[in-house]
Curated annotation (Swiss-Prot):
Sample GO molecular function, one term: iron ion binding
Superkingdom of this protein's organism: Bacteria
InterPro entries: Oxoglu/Fe-dep_dioxygenase_dom, PKHD_C, PKHD_hydroxylase, Pro_4_hyd_alph, Pro_4_hyd_alph_FE2OG_OXY
Assigned keywords, A-Z: Dioxygenase, Iron, Metal-binding, Oxidoreductase, Vitamin C
Binding site for Fe cation: 96, 98, 158
Enzyme Commission number(s) of this protein: 1.14.11.-
UniProt name for this protein: PKHD-type hydroxylase Smal_0990
Residue sites binding 2-oxoglutarate per the record: 168
Cofactor: Fe(2+); L-ascorbate
Length: 225
């Protein structure tokens, strides 16, 4: 499921992030990937051990926890903590698929079900830099307002087109969902949204209760926790 989630961060939060990130020390993004990835990846990244990365990442995780649409769509179980990258001067990342299993700092492993990009630059701040996500329906071009999030299956082939002017700053991270199957997650998300709309429009209370029970029974059947 490819989903645009607006306003994860407020305009004030984005401005604070940018002020601090613009003054940060960035490293070559190729240092964070293997040989094959390094051939396609040309960007800068905030070092993994950076206190700023950890601090800003925590702010993002708190914002996600408060966002009902994100929770409904992702059904998050674990996160690989947010990281930060910057593309400028022709920086790009060719077509690739994210790794299936990632190591967490506590020694646990995370299965990458959902890939997330949180845009921190406004579209008019840079040229190029579109996130291209390829799936069975074709290629989808993504370039969102600062503070907005795109989520998509980690199994998707994707790339970042060259940034030919300005700088594209973003946060990116991965989620292991309680429901690993993307089709099942989408069905649950659609059902949850329908139930909420029925509640808001004064739908039949008994029918809403029954549908809510169906939702939770499906989640119980499909979830891995």
């Amino acid at each position: 499921m490819l989903l645009h989630i607006p306003d994860i961060l407020s305009a004030d939060q984005v401005a604070d992030f940018r002020r601090r990130l613009d003054a940060a020390d960035w490293t070559d993004g190729r240092e964070t990937v293997g040989h094959l990835g390094a051939q396609a990846k040309h960007n800068q990244q905030l070092p993994e051990a950076s206190p700023l990365r950890r601090e800003l990442g925590e702010i993002i995780l708190v914002a996600l926890a408060r966002h009902p649409l994100f929770f409904s769509a992702a059904l998050p179980l674990k996160y690989l903590p947010p990281r930060f990258n910057r593309y400028s001067g022709g920086g790009t990342y060719g077509f690739h698929v994210d790794g299936a299993v990632m190591n967490l700092a506590n020694g646990e492993q995370l299965r990458s079900d959902i890939s997330c990009t949180l845009f921190l630059s406004a579209p008019d701040e840079y040229e190029g830099g579109e996130l291209i996500i390829s799936d069975t329906y074709g290629e989808h071009e993504v370039k969102l307002p600062a503070g907005d999030l795109i989520v998509y299956p980690s199994s998707s082939l994707h790339q970042v087109r060259p940034v030919t002017a300005g700088a594209r700053v973003a946060s990116f991270f991965w989620v292991q969902s309680m429901v690993r199957d993307d089709v099942q997650r989408r069905l649950l998300w659609e059902m949850d949204g329908s139930i909420e709309r029925l509640r808001q429009t004064g739908g039949d209370a008994e029918a809403v209760l029954q549908l809510t029970g169906v939702y939770h029974n499906l989640l119980r059947r499909w979830s891995e926790v």
